[in-house]
């Protein structure tokens, strides 16, 4: 792998040790004494809440791209769910993703896939990124919101509070599966959108980058694997544009529409 940057990137040791600690914690899930079906159930439920409702629906389609609107209380709830995925605070996440779309697969892209699969999957997170300084410029719509500021500042403590709740409800096995294993699982599912869907699959549209549609990533990440479609129509709340491109998050948006909780839903114009 070659990282095409003008200067050698510096390792972010805080991030590196943080990710290492979480992965070590996740391995404790494979110790038989930490296994229970209840703990696995908690992990699966939180996988959907934090990865599906939080990251995919909340952070990504609602806040980053504003592909639909919800009442403010629901937006805050979805952003809280995304914050519990422990992928940084919402302001940083949204800003970084907007930068990615502006510079997709070019050197300023934080996870430029031309720098290799490893880099776009996790490498970019363990090095200091110059794009971090641009986040304020890309998040003016949310940066002054006190709820977003609170979640950005205290996302680690919010995760700790969830861990303590799980410890109270089900003991150490709930913490291992519901926090450590679940966080790492959702990490890699999310990261596959940055790596696998810029390498594997098919391209329906010329989006000006290497984005692809990858069915198995779509399964893991609630429809986010139809990434070439998304890059072609970034504003669209629906990513799976063909009948066989199952998009669970789009189905969720449709349900919210029926309930009167999603309005101004934007859809792709495939004639473009």
From Swiss-Prot:
It is a multi-pass membrane protein. It is an enzyme of class 1 (oxidoreductase). Pathway: Lipid metabolism; polyunsaturated fatty acid biosynthesis. A motif (Histidine box-1) lies at residues 60-65. Its EC number is 1.14.19.28. A motif (Histidine box-2) lies at residues 97-101. A motif (Histidine box-3) lies at residues 230-234. It is found in: Membrane. Keywords: Fatty acid biosynthesis, Fatty acid metabolism, Iron, Lipid biosynthesis, Lipid metabolism, Membrane, Oxidoreductase, Transmembrane, Transmembrane helix. It catalyses: a 1-octadecanoyl 2-acyl-glycerolipid + 2 reduced [2Fe-2S]-[ferredoxin] + O2 + 2 H(+) = a 1-[(9Z)-octadecenoyl]-2-acyl-glycerolipid + 2 oxidized [2Fe-2S]-[ferredoxin] + 2 H2O. Its cofactor is Fe(2+). The keyword Lipid biosynthesis applies. The keyword Nucleotide-binding does not apply. One of its GO terms (biological process) is unsaturated fatty acid biosynthetic process. The chain crosses the membrane at residues 11-31, 39-59, 160-180. Belongs to the fatty acid desaturase type 2 family. The histidine box domains are involved in binding the catalytic metal ions. Desaturase involved in fatty acid biosynthesis. Introduces a double bond at carbon 9 of stearoyl groups (18:0) attached to the sn-1 position of the glycerol moiety of membrane glycerolipids. Does not desaturate palmitic acid (16:0), palmitoleic acid (16:1) and cis-vaccenic acid (18:1). This is sn-1 stearoyl-lipid 9-desaturase. The gene is desC.
């Amino acid at each position: 792998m070659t990282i095409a940057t003008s200067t050698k990137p510096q390792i972010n040791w805080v991030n590196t040790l943080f990710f290492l600690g979480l992965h070590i914690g996740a391995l404790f899930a494979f110790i038989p004494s930490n296994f229970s079906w209840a703990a696995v159930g908690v992990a699966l439920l939180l996988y959907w809440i934090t990865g599906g409702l939080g990251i995919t629906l909340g952070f990504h389609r609602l806040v980053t791209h504003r592909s639909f609107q919800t009442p403010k209380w629901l937006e805050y709830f979805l952003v809280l769910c995304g914050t519990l995925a422990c992928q940084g605070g919402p302001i940083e996440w949204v800003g970084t993703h907007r930068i990615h779309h502006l510079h997709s697969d070019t050197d300023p892209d934080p996870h430029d896939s031309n720098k290799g699969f490893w880099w776009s999957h996790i490498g970019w997170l363990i090095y200091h990124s110059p794009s971090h300084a641009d986040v304020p410029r890309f998040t003016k719509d949310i940066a002054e919101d006190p709820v977003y500021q609170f979640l950005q500042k205290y996302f680690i403590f919010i995760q700790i509070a969830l861990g303590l709740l799980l410890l109270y409800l089900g003991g150490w096995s709930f913490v291992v599966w519901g926090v450590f294993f679940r966080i790492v699982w959702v990490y890699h599912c999310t990261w596959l959108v940055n790596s696998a869907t810029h390498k594997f699959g098919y391209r329906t549209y010329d989006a000006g980058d290497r984005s692809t549609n990858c069915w198995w990533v779509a399964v893991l990440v609630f429809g986010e694997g139809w990434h070439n479609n998304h890059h072609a129509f970034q504003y669209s709340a629906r990513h799976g544009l063909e009948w066989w491109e199952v998009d669970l998050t789009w189905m969720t948006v449709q349900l919210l529409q029926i309930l009167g909780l999603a309005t101004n839903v934007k859809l792709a114009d495939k004639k473009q």
